[in-house]
């Protein structure tokens, strides 16, 4: 009888323990499972980094000369030098030998243009001679008085030993002939927010962005590397004519295409697109 009672109690104990080997009820005391499996492995979940705020690399140029270092006065009777450049020749071998330009065209390039290498040497030379770039609006002011509206020369405050210089770029429209004779083709805003030059290698026909071979971008880089060459961030001024557009974009009207010409609609659409494209530049 005792043996039967012991066997009966053992069977009841086994039946009590068996549910613990099966699936827990939703309302049971199941252990918590992390929602993100990576947490269980001790891994840190991926987090998208916040984009870094844009830092203007030329801010250091604009703030290089503090007011207490501008101890030299340059009055209205003293000369402010001026250098002007046409677009520079990025590929001189192509321009003067390989592009098929006529002899008179080559003479014209030699008379009115400089190569990118010559331009770089000129910048280095005026820098070493103590010149500093100034903004033309700091040199001249427009005033209105009893005699009317006119321009007056200002007195500049310069670092000791420096001489003021204005650089200007003429045309800056990148004529169609320039695209065939070894020049860059336009200015664009790069993904970094800075100005780049678009260029097509005349030998390989590869189009790319560069800061070499263009007067504007080369000066940007030179000033960035020599912040003491600029007063308050001054660089150059553009003397735009609007002839064949500006900055490499064909924004100009064409009076040879009549208003009622079938070609006018396509021309106006392209012109509007070019106007929008140049605005960020």
Which residues make up each language-model segment?
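Sec-dependent N-terminal signal peptides of Gram-positive bacterial secreted proteins and lipoproteins
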Residues: 3-24
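Short, flexible coil/linker segments at or flanking structured domains
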Residues: 5-9, 68-73, 107, 226
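Sec-dependent signal peptide cleavage junction
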Residues: 17-37
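N-terminal low-complexity, Pro/Thr/Ser-rich intrinsically disordered segments
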Residues: 33-81
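Active-site beta->alpha N-cap acidic-glycine motif
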Residues: 77-280
């Amino acid at each position: 009888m005792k043996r039967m009672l012991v066997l009966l109690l053992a069977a009841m104990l086994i039946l009590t323990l068996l549910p613990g080997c099966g699936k827990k009820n939703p309302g049971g005391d199941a252990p918590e499972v992390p929602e993100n499996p990576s947490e269980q492995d001790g891994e840190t979940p991926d987090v998208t980094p916040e984009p870094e705020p844009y830092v203007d690399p030329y801010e250091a140029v604009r703030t290089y000369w503090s007011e207490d270092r501008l101890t030299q006065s340059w009055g209205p009777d003293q000369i402010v030098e001026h250098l002007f450049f046409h677009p520079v020749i990025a590929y001189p071998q192509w321009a003067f030998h390989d592009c098929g330009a006529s002899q008179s065209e080559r003479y014209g390039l030699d008379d009115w243009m400089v190569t990118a290498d010559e331009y770089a040497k000129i910048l280095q030379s005026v820098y070493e001679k103590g010149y500093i770039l100034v903004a033309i609006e700091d040199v001249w002011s427009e005033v209105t008085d009893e005699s009317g509206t006119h321009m007056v020369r200002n007195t500049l405050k310069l670092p000791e030993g420096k001489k003021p210089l204005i650089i200007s770029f003429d045309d800056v429209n990148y004529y169609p002939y320039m695209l065939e004779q070894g020049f860059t083709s336009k200015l664009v805003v790069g993904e970094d927010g800075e100005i780049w030059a678009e260029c097509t290698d005349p030998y390989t026909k590869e189009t790319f962005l560069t800061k070499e071979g263009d007067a504007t971008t080369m000066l940007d880089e030179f000033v960035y590397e020599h912040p003491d060459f600029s007063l308050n961030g001054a660089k150059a001024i553009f003397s735009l004519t609007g002839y064949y557009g500006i900055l490499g974009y064909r924004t100009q009207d064409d009076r040879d295409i009549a208003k009622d010409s079938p070609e006018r609609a396509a021309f106006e659409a392209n012109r509007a697109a070019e106007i929008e494209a140049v605005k960020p530049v």
